[in-house]
Each structure stands twice: as C-alpha cells, then as structure tokens.
C-alpha cells in the first residue's frame, strides 16, 4: 500500500466543487497536497484522524476580515482568530492601501500560518485610522488626494500573488459627508477594471443609491454599476441603503438585476452589518448570499461575530441548506479570488487545507449586529483544522450571547430602517 502523510477516515464529506454532498469517505494527504478522496482508501499514513460523525470540508475561506494587527485599530491575529477557529484562508479587505501594503505583506502575510490574501483599499493609507476604524471623525476618503489610482494599480501589479482585488467604503461618514463618494467610487471601479480584479464595496448609509429612481439610468448606483465578479459586502444590513425596499418589503430591483449580472453578494457580518430581519426577509424571497464572510476585527471577535462558523450557523438557522453554506465559504470565494485550482476543494493536487466540523444541537439565543436575538437550535463548531496538511490547534468554543456586547450595540438598532418592530 502507498504511504501518505495523513489520512482522515470516516468523515462526512461536503465538497461542492466535486459535487460531493454527505458521502462517508476518507481523505489522504501527501506532500502538503490532497492525494485522494474515496471510501476505504488503501493507504498507510504517518498520521491518521478519525472524523466519524463530523463534516469534512475544504479549508474554510473567510472572504472578509481585518488582520493588519497593530498597524490598524481593527487588526486581529489571523492565526489565533481565523486558523484556530477553522479558517485556513483569510482575505484582508482594505486594511492596507498602496502606501501601507508592504507592511501587511512583510509582517502579516509572510509570517502567518493562515493563508492571508488582500483586497487593496483605493485610499493609499487604507484603514490606518479612519472613521469607525480609528474612532476619530471623518474617514479615509474625505480627501480625494488620498485616492491615488496610479499608486493603487502599481501596487496591485507588483503583488498579484497576494492582492486579489480592490476595496472601497461607500458611506457618507467616511467620504466627506457624501461629497466625495461618487468620484471615489468611480476611481475604485476604474482601477479594478484596469487591473482585471474584482471590486468589493461596503455600502451603508451612502449618498450612492441602492435603487436608482425610475428613469435615472445615468445616476451612479450601487450595486447597479458593479460588474460580474464584484463583491457587494454587508448585504444584510438594515440601515439606509439596505437591499430591502422599506415600502413594499421586497429586495430592490437593482439588487436582483445585479445578481443576474453576476455580482456576488457577501455577508460581511461585522460589528454593525448583519440584521436578522433583513436576512429573514431576503431568505423568504430566495435571496441567499453567494459568500458568507465575517468581517472579523478587534471590535467583534467577542460578539456579535465571534468567528466565521458562527456566521455560517446563522444562515443554517435561516434555512440555507448546509451544502450551500459550505459552498459559500469554499469554492465560491476561491473562484471569485481566481484561486480555485489551489484552494476551495478537496481535488487531488490542491493544497491540503481541510476543516473538520461538528454540527451539534444547542438551545441558544444568538444576537445580530443590532441586539435582535434568535433562538438557534443547531450550531457548527470547528473540531480539527489542517493548513497545507499540517494540523493546528482549535481554540475552545465561545458562549453566546455576550451581554456586554449587546449593551454596546443597542444604539445601532435606532439607525435601522428595517428591524423587528418595523
């Protein structure tokens, strides 16, 4: 029998790229790559792990985190807060801009066991200290001089192994009370198009409309001006410019059109950007996320986000099929990042990034970003994680909800136009 480095036996495999949904199989790893997947593999292994009763999936991909630790107020430690909670690939979304990216590369990307990728902020300083990131008034796009398109393009071209797209925040509070939003958005669109990479847009309480007025085809909108492969993050927030028409309770027409065009709707839960009510309305209309992501950062790791699997748990509670939940955190983001030949599946030859998950019963009140609670009856928790075939420790699971965080979040409910009592 052939010898391999690792074999994971008897797991329930969910691998959407290969259309495997619940088969009891073994997974073999050799030389840091997936060697084979099948029933009763005839191999001997240096290390053997029994995954009976557990889900075995490709290594989870968190498509939206902030992990520029110490250099930005939001920066988490990716190995502690992502890898140790079952995530093998984390995408830092906009913490760094062209002027600050090399620090992210040298001190985070190159030193982390977690695979860290990047969406480069259109603002040269990224989220070094701006608006909600730094606790000071104003934001990173208040001054258009900071949005150096040429510098952004040059940084992307020189670092394509790490930089997979562009990021912009469209919110009046970080764009000179809305005065610079249109131009900032146009620059971000132009840079991403010139570099042939996707654009991720944070779109909350913005002067750029979600739904353009009838006949206003020339008015720039979001997501109306996004293209196939672009990311619309924070898709389920309940503030002004939510995806829901507050008059008729339907998902906006421009949002539906964007999905048909190939725009990817990303959860980006965050400290303030996931609303149970918005998600429930969307779910009833079949508007599920393409990608489930956490927007994990220093202000939400102890609630209301906790980790990616907790966000996945919320969509399982909403009725999203488990297979689709796994797909939205594996092959869909891998394809969107142009990395589906390396990560996102258990295909032979791909990097041996593997997450083993327990789906367990619970009876817990789980909060959204604005203090609304739902009674969750099942949860997903990480059991084992392997990055390039190497096993890493899992941190203990956390308790929900965090009452201190609930008190801190209370003010955000007042800003919502969609909420439980409206």
List the model feature ranges, each with a label.
Residues 73, 85-91, 95-96, 111-144, ...:
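Metal-cofactor-binding active-site regions of metalloenzymes
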Residues 11, 27, 32, 53, ...:
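Divalent metal-coordination and catalytic microenvironments
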Residues 103, 147-265, 273-290:
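Histidine/acidic residue-rich metal-binding segments in metalloenzymes
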Residues 277-360:
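His/Asp/Glu-enriched, well-ordered alpha-helical/loop segment
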Residues 66-68, 95-96, 121-125, 139, ...:
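Active-site beta-loop-alpha junctions enriched in small/polar residues
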Residues 1-57:
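Histidine-rich, glycine-flanked metal-binding segment
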Residues 42-43, 51-111:
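Metal-associated gating/positioning segment near the N- to mid-region
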Residues 351-403:
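C-terminal cap of metal-dependent C-N hydrolases
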């Amino acid at each position: 029998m052939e010898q391999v480095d690792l074999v994971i036996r008897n797991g329930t495999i969910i691998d959407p790229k290969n259309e495997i949904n619940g088969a009891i199989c073994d997974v073999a790893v050799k030389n840091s790559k997936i060697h084979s997947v099948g029933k009763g593999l005839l191999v001997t292994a240096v290390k053997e792990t029994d995954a009976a009763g557990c889900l075995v999936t490709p290594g989870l991909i968190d498509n939206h985190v902030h992990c520029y630790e110490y250099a930005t107020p939001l920066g988490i430690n990716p190995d502690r807060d992502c890898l140790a909670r079952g995530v093998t690939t984390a995408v830092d979304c906009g913490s760094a801009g062209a002027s600050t990216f090399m620090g992210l590369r040298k001190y985070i990307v190159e030193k982390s066991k977690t695979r860290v990728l990047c969406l480069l902020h259109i603002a040269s300083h990224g989220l070094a200290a701006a608006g909600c990131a730094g606790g000071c008034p104003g934001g990173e796009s208040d001054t258009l001089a900071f949005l150096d398109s040429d510098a952004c393009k040059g940084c992307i071209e020189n670092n394509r192994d790490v930089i997979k797209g562009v990021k912009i925040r469209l919110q009046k509070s970080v764009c000179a009370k809305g005065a610079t939003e249109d131009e900032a958005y146009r620059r971000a669109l132009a840079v991403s198009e010139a570099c042939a990479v996707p654009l991720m847009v944070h779109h909350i309480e913005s002067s750029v409309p979600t739904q353009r007025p009838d006949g206003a085809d020339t008015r720039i909108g979001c997501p109306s001006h996004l293209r196939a492969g672009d990311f619309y993050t924070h898709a389920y927030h309940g503030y002004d410019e939510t995806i829901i028409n507050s008059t008729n309770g339907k998902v906006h027409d421009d949002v539906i059109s964007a999905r048909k065009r190939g725009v990817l709707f990303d959860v980006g839960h965050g400290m303030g950007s996931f609303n149970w009510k918005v998600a429930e309305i969307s779910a009833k209309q079949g508007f599920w996320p393409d990608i489930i992501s956490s927007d994990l950062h220093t202000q939400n790791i102890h609630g209301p986000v906790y980790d990616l699997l907790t966000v996945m748990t919320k969509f399982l509670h909403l009725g999203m099929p488990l297979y689709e939940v796994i797909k939205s955190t594996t092959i869909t983001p891998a394809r969107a990042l142009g990395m589906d030949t390396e990560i996102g599946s258990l295909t032979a030859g791909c990097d041996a990034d593997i997450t083993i998950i327990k789906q367990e019963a619970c009876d817990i009140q789980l909060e959204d970003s604005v203090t609304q609670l739902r009674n969750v009856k099942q949860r997903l928790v990480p059991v084992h994680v392997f990055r390039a075939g190497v096993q890493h420790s899992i941190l203990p699971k956390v308790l929900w909800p965090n009452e201190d965080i609930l008190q801190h979040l209370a003010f955000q409910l007042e800003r919502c136009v969609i909420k439980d009592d409206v």
